[in-house]
Amino acid sequence: ALLAHAGYKVYVVEPNKERLDVIKTGRSFFFEEGLDSVIKLALQSGTLIPTNSYEESVPDSQVVFSCVGTPDNPDGSSNLTYVFSAAEETAKLAKPATIYVQKSTVPVGTGRKIEALFQELNKKLEYVSNPEFLREGTALSDTLFFDRVVVGGDNQAAVDTVMDIYMN
């Protein structure tokens, strides 16, 4: 919502209908101080577009941020089902040179597996890791007043593009 508020055209792909309906009303489906007003303003300006469709959002996107849940498995390891599902859905629809930014906290080596998935699907996407450092209840201020941004990838131009988004 903050990137949309900054003027970027942002699609929010939310497969859960109840959550999507909440976002469409200008609210968050979880409490975060100040977030509802940011969502509402971005919706009103037309820069935030909530959808359940990768088909609507991915083909025209130059940069795709993947921010999905990584719940714990019973053994305590991260369940990466949503991470790989989002990467696959994006890869199927993205144009070449689309920058795919992984925001979710994932184990070391996950990025290489996502890159292998892109190769397996014969897609030339640029993978960038950009883990978020957000605390529940203060995520909005953590995003606005960050003390560091960690961005990494094999393609320097893709990394620079992601950094430019933060600096604007």
Task: Name each model-derived stretch.
Residues 114-128, 139-168:
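Internal alpha-helical scaffold of NAD(P)-dependent oxidoreductase catalytic cores
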Residues 56-57, 93, 143:
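Structural alpha-helical scaffold elements that stabilize or flank donor/cofactor-binding regions
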Residues 1-28:
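NAD(P)+-binding Rossmann beta1-loop-alpha1 motif at the extreme N-terminus of oxidoreductases
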